[in-house]
Amino acid sequence: MPQQKMKRVKTTITVNGETREVEIEVPDIEAAWGDPQNMRWLGKRIARVEGAEKVTGRAKYTNDVQLPGMLYAKILRSPYPHARIRSIDASQAERLPGVRAVITDLTREPKYVGEEVAAVAAVSEQVARDALKRIHVEYEPLPFVVTPETAREPSAPRVHGGQNVSGGNPRERGDVDSAFRRNDVVVHEATYSVPARSHCCLEPHGLVCQWQGDHLIAWASTQGIFSVRDELAGALGIPASNVRVICEHMGGGFGSKFGARAEGIICARLAKMAGAPVKLMLDREEEHLATGYGPGVTAKVKIAATRDGQLVAWESESYGTGGIGGGSGVPLPYIYPVPHVRTRHYDIATNVGASTALRAPGHPQASFIMESAMDDLAHQLGMDPLEFRMKNDPNPVRQAEYRLGAERIGWHRRNRIAGQAPGVVKRGLGVASAVWGGGGGAGSRPTVRIDPDGSVEVRLGTQDLGTGTRTYVAAIVAEELGLDIRQVKALIGDTDYGYSGASGGSTTTASVAPAVKMAAMAARERLVAVLSQQMQVNPADIVLADGKVTVRGSSERSLTWKQACALLGKEGIEVHGEWNANLQGSGVAGCQFAEVEVDTETGKVRVVKIVAVQDCGLVLNRLAVESQIIGGVLQGVSMALFEQRLFDEQTGRMLNANLEEYKLPGSLDVPDIEAIVYDNPTGKVSGMGEPPVIPTAAAIGNAVFNAIGRRIHSLPITPAKVLQALGKV
């Protein structure tokens, strides 16, 4: 087989839990995606390659894993928001028939309702639940605080022993005070608030763990199979090479499923103790209490612009809580360049479980705060809020998106004076914008293999959250080799495949797709090199298309794909790909327009339509991009009108830790959503899972303001808040 030119590149790998930089050899190939107009698969609306498996029930999720002799685990959780454990007696649980393992050393001082205290593995879920009731725990309740407003008080109970309030260091540029004192500016001041929200993944967190000697196999619902592997290895004190993690399919993560977490380590420990495989799946209450949430934020804002609408100054003081963790910060001011800025943000510790990333962490909160302030200031200036944005937004992609979205929503129909719509049920229009990174990075190392029988597979240890990774991986290889997408088998979700990073931050596509493209190009080059020798033609004259191999200028000389692959001999072709920065882009832009109806007698808000215009660079699968936009908008509608975690300050308990009182939109709440994919001619791929959720709530809030002429300063926008704003309650 002809020798291929190679080059050495640096990449990051993880071995036994340790991350380090190494040099590897990869094919030396010029990289470009090519002209989208000439592509058969990429950029088109491609049905999911695993779609039939999912709709017929053949797709295997974590809860579908069934192993011989498998046990079922349950976790005993603290009923107190803060307590000291004086004693634990698990003897009655251990004697219960069917119980195989019990753990009681998980914590001595739980700091939130729902923290893990003990766990059992038994022959059935019912036996495991009964065993939990037989574990007797003596608690000493301790002082606690569950709301950031109370936790800020000097007399509030200390969550970690020290101060509850951290941060607050000013971030400043320009001369803020002088800018606000200028005679030619209009100043707006207000306070805006966004509550914490649960992830509410369709599939709950869970694992199945099975030991084979000193090797562990874990089936996990996770956004990062290698993250789970490394975390389990570290916690169990074994080499990472002894841990295999599998995630064939999963039902969403939204930022909450990056590691093994407590339940993963508990599951593995119980399986080791019991000498049998163990399944541990969390229920909906546990999902709310112990798997994280997106933190809320409250911001006191001061914003100024000249009378002709040029932004001049921004000042904000904000606070939020990540529970017993941190990370409630938001990127303020958001999107629009402001020359004079001063911000302070405070993290407030509370006796609530630790927050985690939630789709576009911090950005939906920042968007609601910034875009509400922008509309309010535009109202004071007497300017069209869209004109005000376009005057202050230098991004050329968003400028084009504004024009496109305004046309599609019929922006000319908006109330020129907010609240002046006739009738009891008033209509209004609003707009808001988004920005996201969407770039990727090195680390993914896929393998493409072509066998002599014509079968083609691509293997990579990434995972598909439901976003369509498996489909575009197959499409990239099919495009490069001139095959039908059904001729390419995409194998992902297993740490036995090549390394790939966690799926989050909209980085997966921009990290995985370039590496798969490089592997597919290398496979094509190797194949063409062999065929050119066998067919005695110039490699440049060989054409791979429509599942055939032809020679340019000689139509009678053609081979079927199987005939061509048979010429490879017994070895076949197996090549690896490495990330190429020339194939990925970053900095995706988007905007959304909302139309709402507000019943001024009941206070009910109905979202009539959302027009969402989103950029993502080179589109790999248009159908998947449209689906991501629609899904993001629905989460944004939910954030705007429904979601809020409610706590009882007297008991520290979450009052709506279920899917009955924790409100989510139903089918009747879904508006008409027009998803517009803005084709940005960069020729490079970017991620876009996050940005569609960012501006929705802000656009809806601004539409409500346009309808009734009153600002709802906090989410969710409930009927009670609307009626209060109208002075009717």
Please tell me what each predicted stretch does:
Residues 2-9, 18, 95-96, 237-244, ...:
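C-terminal catalytic domains of large/alpha subunits in multi-subunit enzymes
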Residues 223, 438-457:
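Active-site-adjacent "gating/activation" loops or surface patches in catalytic cores
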Residues 73, 216-220, 455-460, 607-609:
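Short, aliphatic-rich beta-strand segments
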